[in-house]
């Protein structure tokens, strides 16, 4: 407990892994600021945290809109005085836009998927870094810690079941962005890392959760996780990256995948995308 005592953590997203992380951060003593597009989700999460005795504030914002991102960062600083940590989670599947194999993806589907999964994280990072650069280092000597959300689909694809190329490209770009940021802001003592979960029980995974063939594959592909990761398993890793326990760690991608990336198991042949 209290591994994040006295810290201010900004979390983008308000369901799934973002919600699990926000609740765990508050439980570890952090003041938590939540921002996502859906005000009802933000409010419900904030109410749960407050009911448990946590410090919390929120602002609904379209994180692909630069002005709204800036307002969210301003609100966080006004509420809690600074930003020590960012966990940038918000994003989602591009299937509703038409994401799929590249030969089937329209320009609009590509743009919409990258807007949701890459532009959002880039804009939030820019606004938060500007704030971190303007503030004094904390007692551990760092100005802040940033954790980005990647995915094993970018590095360990399973095209038979998860053939969404725009999403994979966005998540691959997140890893590149993380590395570039870590190098750029190292002299400023801002740490930047990323996590890459495999199939996790979140609203985004509803399609998989209802498909027995996908679940059977997941049980064999990520045996340490069972069918799916629990969002709190990602949240626990996030606490490490945002706490002083990782004060010398930057530029790293951690796969949280139950064995997915080292397991050569493939789905049964003939499965349609």
Language-model-detected regions and their locations in the chain:
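Catalytic loop of short-chain dehydrogenase/reductase
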Residues: 92-93, 137-173, 178-187, 199
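Short, small/polar-rich loop/turn modules that mediate ligand/substrate recognition or access, typified
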Residues: 87, 186, 191, 249-251
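A short, exposed helix-loop element centered on a Lys and neighboring polar residues
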Residues: 125-126, 179
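Substrate-binding pocket helix/loop in short-chain dehydrogenase/reductase
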Residues: 97-114, 218
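C-terminal helical subdomain
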Residues: 194, 213-249, 256-258
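Short C-terminal tail/terminal secondary-structure segment
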Residues: 250-273
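Canonical Rossmann dinucleotide-binding motif of NAD(H)/NADP(H)-dependent dehydrogenases/reductases
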Residues: 2-33
